[in-house]
Structure formats: C-alpha cells, structure tokens
Amino acid sequence: MGNSRDDFTSATKELLANRVGRRCSNPACRKLTCGANTNPEKITNIGVAAHICAAAQGGPRYDASMTPEERKSFENGIWLCQSCSKLIDTDITRYPKELLQSWKQLAEQTAILEVETTSSTPALSNFIWSALIVQPFKMTFIKKVEWRILIKRLKIR
C-alpha cells in the first residue's frame, strides 16, 4: 500500500521555516526552533512544517475539496515548534484553518520587520505590544508599582 499522505517537499519545509525566521508562528510562542548542537557539525531543530489542512483523510482540518498538490503546497503549511504543532492538531475547534492562516501571515510580517530594522528589538516590541496590554497599578500595602498583563486577542487585517 502506498503513502496516502500529501507531505511537503524538503524545499517547501525550508521555505516555511525561513520565511518566519525559523521561529514558531504561534504568536503566543514565537520560540526559536533551530540552534547549535554540541556536535559542531550538527544543528538542533525543534521546528515542524505543519499542515493547516490535514495531509491525509481523517487528519485535523482535512478538506476533501483540496487536490494533493494544494495539500502539500506552501500555502497549506505553517512553521511551528513541536509543542504548538501538537497543540493545534489536538483541539481543531480552538485552532481552525483561518486562525492558523492569520498566525502564518503575522509571523511572516514580523520576520520581515526584524530583517528591515537594525535591531530585532523594535519588531519584537511591536509584536508583543500588539498581543498584550500592560497596565501599571499601585499596591498600597507594600507601596511598590506592580505590573498586570492582560492578554488581548489579536485582530489580523
């Protein structure tokens, strides 16, 4: 019996990883997925080229209307760390196709901002501020300023 999965090519996997700076595309994670290994001739990679719509029938977010070429295309892929890849496939109601597509778009936009700036700090700051609202408040009993972080759902244009 042949392979019934429409897997990405190596070139597609590389393109997915490189277009987001080899960082997880989940805006709540953004973990670097590749780095040095103790063996100087190797790298450590924890990144995964995940399918937005499943590569095979019965998989998460499978779309029967897609052709095999569409299922294994760059457009149907997203670069994630291993944890986030497992997460999106475990709860498909919480992580629908449209959300994953918005993550991919935001991750690519963030990566290009990092490339265009002299330091990655402004791009990362813009990314963080678009995801978080930070409000200072004073704790009267200890007389110190504390920080409270509220998570706000991102609105992707």
Residue map of PLM features:
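A boundary/linker detector
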Residues: 1-21, 33-34
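Short metal-coordination and nucleic-acid-contact micro-motifs, chiefly zinc-binding Cys/His arrays
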Residues: 17-25, 73-77
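Charge-rich interaction segments
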Residues: 110-157
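Histidine-centered nuclease catalytic patch
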Residues: 2-5, 31-77, 88-105
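Short cysteine-rich clusters marking metal-coordination/redox-active sites
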Residues: 24-29, 81
